[in-house]
Amino acid sequence: MEQSFMQSAMAMGAQSKKGFSRSIAVERKNLITVCRFSVKTLLEKYTAEPIDDSSEEFINFAAILEHILSHRFKGSGSWFDGQRSFWDFIRLACSKVPNNCISSIENMENINSSRAKGRAWLRVALMEKRLSEYIATALRDSRTTRRFYDEGAIMLREEATVLTGMLIGLGAIDFSFCLKGEALDGKSEAVIDYTPYLKFTQSYDYLSDDEDGQSVDSSNSDDSVEHPYIPLVTDEESWRNKCRKMEQRFKIVNAQKGYLEELVRLRESQLKNVEMENKKLTAGLEELQQQSQKEKRELENIILELQEQLTSLIPGESHPLSKDLSIPLVNQWPSLQNYNNQEDSKLYHRGSFPSPEPHISLTTGSQRTERKQNGKSWCTAEKDYTPSMLGLCGSMSSLPSCKSLPSLRSTECLVNISAEPSPALTPS
């Protein structure tokens, strides 16, 4: 008994699960079909003129697309997050779209709720003619998509790829919206009007679409009229209608073709600009490299010259010093005049003069020079003596020379006066 009850319960659960999945599949198919009808209506009526918020076809299309993006959407994660909408998914999944409008919509002051931001994004994407690009980019982020949608959602099925293909044709239409209207308040629910599509018949210019002739909710009802095939018409009025519809279809395709050609030209111009900029940057980089190499070589040459100068100065440092020191020694001890030709040499002792002891004072500089000469003669002079030394050598008994006697350290001095160029005064 209990076993049969459990089996029946499991069977009922399986049937309810199948019924639930079937209802989700029907809902998914109906939304995609209605979206296809809505896009076709927009392309047929508004190819030559822009669309604004007052268009009923656009209001219905916006409601359909909002239902598609909200199909099987998960609720808020916690109680303080508030009611989430598809904008939370778009904000994360479309952040990688180049030059996107996500940050602009986030910074709008008059739009606060998540639903209002989603509606504003839908209008901005249509005005940018990039709605299909946004949705295609969001679908590539499968991890984020599974995070925001439950199993069976349109965004997780192959119908999402069909949706992006349908939305490409909207690039041929010019949209103009005001982002401060009542439609962006986010308080009212988006309601789809199915009445224009309940008895939608297949037109002559969409013969290849098999699903377009089916109705949405009442496809199996008695009121719906099916038109699987178009009968062959021969009257003139029917041919005119067919020609008129084909002409309208041609205008739509031509407008789409013009839009795609313009898009291709834009991308080609952008590519050329990028290539030119790349060439300029490459040339500038090469020029900078050449300039840096030139400056490097110049700096290396300067370093080599400085090194040569240093190596030439360091070994010959003592030669200019000896030259500079020899000049003041010669000037300080010039040659004495020949004031006595009879005597060749005289030896002066401290006690040989009746006057106070004469001496020859040596300055500290001369003593230092004597030390630097390493034992060489500290006074060199030739035979031709100058009068500047007469006061030092000829007036030994004068008073100024006597006053400088205490500074004399040596006891005797030898003055050689001869014809040979020998030192004039050497200490004995």
Swiss-Prot record:
Query: Pfam families in the record, alphabetically?
Result: RUN
What domain of life is recorded for the organism? Eukaryota
One biological-process term from Gene Ontology? Answer: positive regulation of cGMP-mediated signaling
Q: Which SMART domains match?
A: RUN (SM00593)
Q: Which residues form the RUN domain?
A: 52-182
Q: Does the keyword Coiled coil apply?
A: yes
User: Could you tell me which residues belong to the region Disordered?
Assistant: 349-375
The record's section on InterPro entries has: Run_dom (IPR004012), Run_dom_sf (IPR037213), RUNDC3A_B (IPR047340)
The alphabetical list of record keywords is: Coiled coil
* Coiled-coil positions: 237-314
Q: Which family does it belong to?
A: Belongs to the RUNDC3 family.
Q: What is this protein called?
A: RUN domain-containing protein 3A
Organism whose genome encodes this protein: Danio rerio (Zebrafish)
Q: Which gene encodes it?
A: rundc3a
